[in-house]
Every structure is written in C-alpha cells, then in structure tokens.
Amino acid sequence: MKTKNLMTLLLAAIVALQFNNGLIAQEMNKMWGEQSAGNTEVKRGRFFDWGNYAMFIHWGLYSQLANKWDGATYYGNSEWIMNKNMAGIPLDEYKAVAKSFNPDKFDAKQFAQLAKDAGMKYIIITSKHHDGFAMYHSQCNKFNIVDATPFKRDPMKELSEACKELGLGFGFYYSHNQDWTYPGGTSGPKVDHEGNPKTFDDYFVEKCLPQVEEITKNYGEIELIWFDTPGRMPKQYAKQLVEVVHRNQPRALVSGRVGFGLGDYRTFGDMEVPLENVEGLWEGVDVTNDSWGFAWYDQNWKTPKQILGYLIATIARGGTYMLNVGPDPSGQIPEMAQISLRTAGEWIARYPQVIYSAESSPWKHALPWGDVVVNDGKIYLAVFDWSSYGKLYLPGLKSEITSVKLLTGNKSQKLNFTREGNLTIINTPCPKPEKLVSVIEVSIKGDIEVDNTLFVDPELGLKISTKFSTPENCNVKYKGWLEKYGEWKHIYQIGDWNDKSSTTWNFEIMTPGRYFVELTATGTGNRVWNVMTDEGFEIQNRQNTSSIYHTQPIGWVNFKTAGKHSLTVRIPEGERANTSLAEIKLTPFE
C-alpha cells in the first residue's frame, strides 16, 4: 500500500465533505504550507499520492500533421510521425510545418476545466517531445511555438495559470535524451548547419539543460517533471537534471523515466496495469484512444466504464493513473474524449472515496466481479459485473464485519450478509444501482485480514493469468509487444514447454459441479491440451493456434467437493516449443 500520513487522512475527510467546492485546493495548500514550515524535509508530489488520477496531454507540431504526410496515413503514435519507423520526414521539411501550426481555438481554461470535471487532480503536458519542438516560449532555442509559428502565444503559461485558478496541479513532460532536430541530441543530426560535429554534451549544455531550467523556473509551482526514454545517455546528465528540478521545484517529483533509478517514483510501461499489488510510489500511463498525439483516423475511444476500470484497477494495485488526451490541430480536445472523461468524472464526484486517498486492495489482485480499494479503514467494493441472482460473493475476508452498505451517491442502503466458511455473501438488489460501477462499503472491526486465495465465483467463474500459476519445467514470463507502432499490449505467459512441462492454479470453489474450461494462447500449428483437477478428473482436446492470442474451448471438468482445489495444464502432444499460454477461464454450469 502507499504510505499515508496524517495530512492524507485529513484530506480524505475534506474530500468527503467538500468534494464539489473550491475549498479543497485551499485546504491542501494551507496544510502543505504548515507541513513544510515545520519540517526541513519538503514533501514532494502534493497531488500524486493523494489524488491518484491525472491528465496527460501530448500536444505538439505533430498534432498539425495528425498522422498524414505526403498524401499517406501512418498508423501509430502521431508524435513519432517524423521518425524513420513511420513517415521518415526530413528534418527541414518537418521544421517547416511550424509555419502553418496555428491552434487558434486553444483555450487553457477549457483544458483545465475538463480535467477538473473528469475528477483529475493535476495536468502534465508535453513541453518538448522527441521532435525537439518546444510548446512554450523558450529563450535558448527558436524552434518553439512562439518564435516559429503564427500562433505567437505561450500556451504553457496560460495553462499553468488556468490550473492554479482551478486548484489543479501542473507539470511538464520533457524528452531529455531524444531530440531529432537539434545537433547532438539522440537520433538527431550529428553536425550543425555549418557542418561542425556535435555531441550529446553539446545538445545537453546548449538546449536540454537550459530548457529544463526554463520550465522549472518560469511557470509557478510544478507538480512533477516527466522525463522520457533515457536510452543510453550517460547517467551524469540525468543526475544533473534531477538536481535542477529538485533545486528549482523542491516539491516536484521526477518521474522514473529519467532513468538510472534516479526518479522519485516508478513509471510502468505505456498502457500497462500490473496484475498484482506493487509497493511504493508508482504510476500507470494510458491513452483515451490508441495514439498519444492526435491522429485523424483514431476514433477508438475508451468508454467511461473502461476509464473507471483502468483507474480503479491501478489504484487497487497501489498506483496513480495518468490518462492522456491529444488535442487536434486547432488546439481542441476531441469531443468523444471529453464525453467519456466527463461521464467518468460524474461517477467520481458521487464516489470520491473510491479514488482520492484510496489505498491498494488487501486481496492484492482483482476479483471476479471487480476490484477493491481501502480508504480510512473501510473497504470499498467496486462492482463492475453486478449479480443477476442477488448475491455478491466476497472471498477470504477474515475480519469481523460491522456493516455493509450499498452507496448511491450521497445515500446509502444497508445490505444483509451471511458468512459461510471463507466467504461473505452479500444480498444485493436488482437491477444494478449504477450504470457504470456500483459501490458497496464494508466496515470492519479492527485490522483488515484477508486470505487472498483465488476464488471461482459461483455466478461469474474465474478468468486468471498464468502469472498466478505455478509452473514446472517451464517459465512464466512478462511479454510486451506493439499491436501497431506505439500501441503496447502486456501479458504474462508461459513458454518453453516440453513433454515434462505443466502449470498449476490453486483456487477455492463454493459450489461443486461442472465448470467449462477455456485457454487463451498463441503459437503455430496444433497441440493437445491436457487439463486435470486435483481430484483426478481429466479432459484433453487438440486445438490449433495462431499468431494472435485467442481463447479456445477445452471442455468440462467436474469438482466433487467445495473448498480449495487445483487444476493443472499440460501439452502431451503437438507443437510445444512456440506455444504461449496466457490465461485460463473457468465458467460454472448453469
């Protein structure tokens, strides 16, 4: 769990009483001032640990192109369109795009208000991405939005002021290693315009370091600086940048992507939510659609329920969630992104205790119907799959329960419950009370004690990663890949199969009987899957696989008794070597 102090608990109380009024920001600033006045060690990240939710904005010269160049559309992250892996735009031609970049519909107050309406607590925006173009008025390099474009305004100054007015934190993304247009920057030209050789040290001294000084001195108080892609840059440069940030902004965090373990917190891979709890300060970063910067074709927007799903899952694993939007060439955030964000924000306004100052789940992983967070000693069940039979099964809670309540905004309804062995069975009303995510508050006596054994829900079954299995003569490994350029997918999978390999899941079932088994896998050719229970019930099925993960039916197994059981998967025949097994799913017979 994240470490919470007295200040955080006080903030939680303020949120509960004053969520929809501007006193939150005032109280936070007051308490931070009091804390730092009496403490020589300044606490960093005012909003990061408490707020749990932030807006990321990828906006730059690439937004003008919107993934089109020379009549062709390039699919992937728009901020990479200049790169050789996409359009491979020559440096001078890319820089010339600045002459037509005029996002005249940009309104900083609208950006900040959207973040506030969405329930986000701070904004991080690209001050300079890999293309080297500065989205603020840089004094050390003319390739910036004020000096090189007809826009002639500093949107970062306007946005920092709008955030301050609305009580939001503000900070910058800065690409410290890659600079594709400045001589000496990684992946940039090796010589200047006069043909003189340039090194990374030249780039660092002439542009990178001065610009980090600018963004940490000229825009008021900063929540954090989000560096990116350190690559093979020497550690000494990253160390110097961290020192600059901490000197100029004592309360600001430095992201883990500065490299070399020098950051104040850990940043996971793009679009990645861990499957198990992670200790310490960390964040997950994600997109509202597929591309970070604006792409004309990209309409694959996350729904409000999907946004809440990723947000709550990140908090339940112990992290902070930062969700990206990409303004269009006119400087406006796409309408569908706004709709999803505001709708999710309306839900957050009804259930702030599920988000702000919330801590990780004692179960340490998701449950079949949703996820769990803890706030001020109370357990909050975020139920995504509401029971159609009027029962919610909460496994493994050992603590004495004093009350169970269904929350509906500012109202609550007492729910009856029973305890059966390792299960708490909560009687729930039909239909589901919330369109998006329903919330049940469980109050307990004393400390929270949990047996986090996997549980096969009598109604929903269980879908679980191989990360939670025990392999023998094979290995569970993390796997990440690009679905298309810039769009990451993440799984854990079992590979390195041979004729002696197996993997076993341990879990608990409440209802004896038959369960349908499905496996999610990839590979080439055919293989035979063998599935056996701890009671000796065995099924076997031959299936073909493909280069993409898909779910395959295997058959029915039978568990004769309730309680703790295990299920083991083997490949007795067929193409083993290139097989990747990602998940197993058990569905109860109805």
Residue ranges and their predicted role:
Residues 1-27:
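Bacterial Sec-dependent N-terminal signal peptides
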Residues 26-511, 518-521, 525-559, 564-590:
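Mature catalytic domains of secreted/periplasmic carbohydrate-active enzymes
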